[in-house]
């Protein structure tokens, strides 16, 4: 059983919510922890060159690499071996070139099992991935990509 003490100051900004599941949520507790950190806080959107999500599309699969480009579903991004044997048609992939993964991106699953964070290395290059990934292109001039990945992978980043 979870218990906590709340006061009216925590109820008023939250639309007068009295249900305990809201106030005992780990995201709310971690958010309060972050509010009390003495360091400068910046928005995730201000640390990146680009953050984007792909459009929904129907997939046309082919049997071999000669006629296709390697395809990754969201659940494939956390696998040790990402060579799934699935290939998206090269004709279709021309229209979806913006979904081709690049090295040093951070991808976050946003459908199914949400919140899985993956840092793309050279093995991810030239793989086209599902629209169910938030793609973050880090800007090292604002924050080092390793720090951003570490934060997003932590319990604090997960609750954002």
Go through the PLM ranges and name each one.
Residues 154-160:
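Specificity-determining recognition surfaces
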Residues 73, 93-152:
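A short beta-sheet element
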Residues 41-44, 127, 145, 158:
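Alpha-helix initiation and N-capping motif
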């Amino acid at each position: 059983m979870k218990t906590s003490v709340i006061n009216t100051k925590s109820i008023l900004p939250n639309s007068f919510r009295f249900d305990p599941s809201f106030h005992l949520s780990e995201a709310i507790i971690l958010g309060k922890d972050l509010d009390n950190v003495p360091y400068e806080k910046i928005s995730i959107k201000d640390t990146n060159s680009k953050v984007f999500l792909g459009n929904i599309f129907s997939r046309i699969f082919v049997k071999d690499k000669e006629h296709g480009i390697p395809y990754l579903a969201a659940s494939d991004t956390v696998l040790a071996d990402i060579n799934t044997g699935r290939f998206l048609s090269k004709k279709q992939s021309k229209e979806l070139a913006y979904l081709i993964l690049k090295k040093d991106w951070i991808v976050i699953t946003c459908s199914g099992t949400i919140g899985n964070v993956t840092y793309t290395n050279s093995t991810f290059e030239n793989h086209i991935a599902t629209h169910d990934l938030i793609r973050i292109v880090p800007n090292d001039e604002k924050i080092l990509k390793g720090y951003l990945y570490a934060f997003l992978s932590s319990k604090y980043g997960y609750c954002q």
